[in-house]
Amino acid sequence: MDTQKATFGAGCFWGVEAAFAAIPGVTATAVGYEGGSQENPSYKDVCTQDGQPNRGQPTHVEVVEIDFDPEKVSYGKLLDAFFELHDPTTLNRQGPDWGTQYRSAIFYHSPEQEAEAKAKIEALSIEGRFEPKKIVTQVVPAETFWRAEDYHQRYLEKRGMASCHI
């Protein structure tokens, strides 16, 4: 089986991972950090700046990296789920969580994924699905995925529902 990767930032990664893991055709998920400049960041590094909650300076995004079987689930279906899971019109915020680590982002792994993600955003905008707000989701090339600490992996599966926007 040849799998492909997809990486999404849609707020607190605990609930996002649980939602994607439940989709038939998704073969593996991992939560982590992507899109910042610090190497091998910790959760504390991503969520704080100078000991205070990170509310301004861009840093890594909390993301879910997904392995999926394209014979069983398309990238387009994963994009549909991504836009259902969170509010792509809120800048650096999802539910009660706010800071740049919670920004809406699609990290594409191929030119085809980039084109499909941009086309999906355009279609949603034309459809007016989120009007009067505008979609602020970033569509950027995948960078180094820094796997989050073990206690974050499958967090809701291990601990049950927590304070998460999903």
Where are the regions that the model predicts?
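Flexible coil/turn and secondary-structure edge motifs
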Residues: 1-166
